[in-house]
Amino acid sequence: MLYPLARHFLFKLNPEQAHDLSIKYLPRLLGTPLDCFFRHSLPKRPVTVMGLSFANPVGLAAGLDKDGECIDAFGAMGFGFIEVGTVTPRPQSGNDKPRLFRVIPAEGIINRMGFNNKGVDHLVAQVKKAKYQGVIGINIGKNKDTPIEQGKDDYLICMDKVYDQAGYIAVNISSPNTPGLRSLQYGDALDELLAALKVRQQELAAQYKKYVPLAVKIAPDLTPDEINQVAASLIKNGIDGVIATNTTLERDMIYDMPHAAEAGGLSGRPLQHKSTEVIRQLAKALDGALPIIGVGGIDSAMAAREKLAAGASLVQIYSGFIYKGPDLVKEIVTHI
């Protein structure tokens, strides 16, 4: 695999340039002799979660393909599912640049992207065009300029528009880069949002004559009591799954490393243990009521197995994929 060579080139660019270049050119390599460098034929590891059939339990986490423009290329790498987004009702440019930083000594990434995306209508058009046969999750959020009190409306708008094209819908209430968003994870605000989403899910299921599961993505920076409260709310409102976790605001693991003082969410290896502990606590609180998709610092088959042992049914990768490349998918699926 030539990824180490590609990484050497990409890491000479700033992180956002490298990302944009990859998203632009990867689809163009499909169907050419060069796609042999990332196309994988992997062993089947079928699993059924949230009523959906996955060819294997390894997925691409949201954030890498925000606008769904690279689905088939990522699919060729062997992912059992691909989560696109986060997408918002209206296009938005996100936060000021620079907003993406590599913490290379720790194989971590700090981002404060701010839900930059081309809007939900563009994303849905891209998903419709995709030939990928696996499960596509669509991660939805709210626009930055939508008051938090009206945030529920943005989620419902997105849900209406993506429902017919989504394998499952992921509700992102845990990004640290949209002001006030994480407040939706607590108490009455969470209950009110989940209740509204559940009602709309039932309406859309009747309209389209199919049931699309809802999964909620949570932060790692929750206390044990908060994890218990989130679990109770998920069960109470009949949510189908939970994604644990998003990025962390903590910096203890990288305090003396380059970019440690940058604002934003930290992902990658520094998040590995913290996210696994949240999964372990969450699994205990849920007691099998709904499945967990584990994400956070997975950079090896062993790290993936730790997430599964802690209580996850599926896993997702992002930062580990940036550092290790497509062979990481093959390693995890083969040795999980």
From Swiss-Prot:
Pfam families with a match to the protein in the record: DHO_dh (PF01180)
Binding site residues for FMN: A62, G63, L64, D65, K66, T86, N139, N172, K217, T245, G268, G297, Y318, S319
PROSITE patterns registered for this protein in UniProt: DHODEHASE_1 (PS00911), DHODEHASE_2 (PS00912)
Protein's UniProt keywords contain Hydrolase: no
Cofactor: FMN
Subcellular locations according to the entry: Cell membrane
GO cellular component, one term: cytoplasm
Gene3D superfamilies referenced in this protein's UniProt entry, alphabetically: Aldolase class I
Any one of the GO BP annotations: 'de novo' pyrimidine nucleobase biosynthetic process
Family from the record: Belongs to the dihydroorotate dehydrogenase family. Type 2 subfamily.
Complexes and interactors: Monomer.
Protein name in the entry: Dihydroorotate dehydrogenase (quinone)
Organism field: Aeromonas hydrophila subsp. hydrophila (strain ATCC 7966 / DSM 30187 / BCRC 13018 / CCUG 14551 / JCM 1027 / KCTC 2358 / NCIMB 9240 / NCTC 8049)
Top-level taxonomy: Bacteria, Pseudomonadati, Pseudomonadota, Gammaproteobacteria, Aeromonadales
Gene, per the UniProt record: pyrD
